[in-house]
A protein has these predicted regions:
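Short, hydrophobic/proline-enriched secondary-structure or compact coil segments at domain edges
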Residues: 26-38, 61-78, 188-193
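Surface-exposed strand-loop-strand hairpins of Gram-negative outer-membrane beta-barrel proteins
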Residues: 41-51
Length: 251
């Protein structure tokens, strides 16, 4: 009987060894996403291009399930060439009001896995089926909306080419992404992004900017990555901009 009791105790111990404990991730986080691609830009040809999207995420937790509410701050675009400069205005970012996303935590012997469900966001248009409906190609299409409120169709992006050709492009976009990674600690999550995007230029103030940018994701999966870091709830987007290099140090 004594041996049986000892055996049961040992079994109970070994069955629990290696199982990581689900942490409490409730709070305010910053989410930084890097989207690298190979793009074909006007007058510049094929170049490595990347967009870094920076936003706050308010996380609520129910056991292993997270509800994530995003608040976009800014997007930094590296066009991969000094010949082209793309600027995403503050009004563009302020107009984005994403719906809540969900993520699931899973305890494994390697640690806590983080898996956020596939998320679809359409910008500058309202589609019956955001996932499969084709994007509008005409600025007078009734599905097109002036989402950033500047009196122009779709969303406005500023572009400069060669320092002399500059203007605004009015676009619609569809972005899909899924995050998968690991909880590094109670204040840090890292992982990779699976994503696709579509963009249509509806119109532009300069005819040279009316061509749609052609691009494809960078073939290196490790280059598509994200970082989540817990921050003070009192932080603003300006605080985040000022401390971005500090947050990214060593990543």
């Amino acid at each position: 009987m004594k041996r049986a009791t000892v055996a049961l105790l040992l079994l109970a111990v070994f069955c629990c060894v290696g199982a990581a404990e689900i942490p409490d991730l409730t709070g305010t986080w910053v989410l930084i996403q890097v989207y690298p691609q190979i793009a074909v830009l006007p007058l510049a040809g094929e170049v490595p291009r990347s967009s870094t999207v920076v936003q706050f995420v308010d996380v609520a937790q129910d056991g292993e399930t997270l509800t994530m509410r995003d608040r976009y701050c800014f997007t930094l675009v590296d066009d991969g060439t000094p010949l082209v400069k793309t600027d995403i205005p503050e009004a563009f970012m302020a107009a984005l009001v994403p719906t809540p996303r969900t993520a699931v935590l899973r305890a494994t012997e390697e640690g806590i896995a983080f898996d956020a469900a596939n998320y679809v966001e359409v910008r500058g248009a309202v589609l019956d089926d955001p996932l499969t409906d084709p994007l509008p190609i005409d600025p007078v299409d009734p599905r097109v909306i002036d989402q950033d409120g500047d009196g122009q169709p779709g969303m406005t992006v500023r572009v400069t080419v060669l320092g002399i050709v500059e203007g605004e492009t009015y676009i619609v976009q569809r972005v899909q992404y899924r995050l998968a990674g690991w909880v590094i600690g109670p204040d840090r999550i890292e992982g990779r992004i699976e994503w696709t995007d579509e963009q249509v230029v509806l119109a532009a103030t300069n005819p040279l900017l009316e061509a749609d940018t052609i691009g494809r994701p960078d073939p290196d999966p490790a280059a598509h990555r994200f970082l989540m870091v817990r921050v003070n709830p009192a932080w603003t987007c300006e605080t985040l901009r000022e401390r971005l290099s500090e947050i990214l140090k060593g990543w």
